[in-house]
Design a protein with these regions (language model features):
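Structured, hydrophobic secondary-structure cores that serve as assembly/anchoring elements
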Residues: 1-194
């Protein structure tokens, strides 16, 4: 039990084109998470699409990397140059190195590159499916930060959900010395100055 201090990055199945990925994300025919759809609405989760065509640094071979790999890279990069409460997306913190294109696997197991238009990206984003797009001048960029939070609020953004998870984890550590202390003015003053 992580007490909602973790963040889960979810992949759409590799074989789905963008229309199928949106249908899968909306999970209209699914009764549980799986190939038929995604039914979860966890605040501390986000789905990214499509996958990326990249190079394995160990072998030099071209491989298809899952969208979660690309998203995780941008999370790490964003955290390195800013903080958890900055969006790991966009042209500043969402650029992906070492990815030539984005797409999906066909039924013949071939990588099919896709080009997401503004309309495609908007439709995906409204369906809580974070687009990974290739821009001519900028390259591959994570261009969304929606969580699977069930309603419109600040928590339907990755940066806010990650900040909340981070604060939960930090508060449990910071508050530990005050356990079993008397609930008096001195303890409250010490706790307030600590927080």
């Amino acid at each position: 039990d992580r007490d909602e201090t973790a963040f889960i990055i979810v992949d759409a199945p590799f074989r789905l084109n963008q229309t199928e990925a949106i249908s899968w994300k909306q999970g209209t025919t699914a009764t549980e998470n799986g190939e038929d759809g995604l039914v979860t609405s966890n605040t501390y989760s986000a789905v990214y699409y499509p996958h990326a065509y990249t190079t394995n640094p160990a072998t030099g071979d071209n491989v298809v990397a899952p969208a979660s790999h690309i998203a995780l890279y941008t999370f790490a990069y964003s955290d390195n140059v800013s903080f958890q409460w900055f969006a790991p997306a966009g042209l500043t913190r969402g650029q992906v190195q070492n990815a030539a294109s984005v797409g999906y696997l066909t039924s013949e197991n071939e990588f099919k590159s896709v080009s997401l238009t503004q309309g495609n990206r908007d439709t995906m984003y409204n369906a809580k499916l974070n687009p990974i797009a290739r821009f001519p001048a900028e390259g591959v960029v994570v261009f969304g930060q929606k969580t699977l939070h069930p309603s419109a609020s600040a928590l339907d953004r990755v940066n806010v959900a990650r900040l909340t998870a981070y604060l939960r984890e930090r508060f449990s550590v910071i508050a530990r010395p005050f356990l079993f202390e008397p609930n008096d003015e001195d303890t409250r003053r010490n706790a307030k100055s600590t927080f």
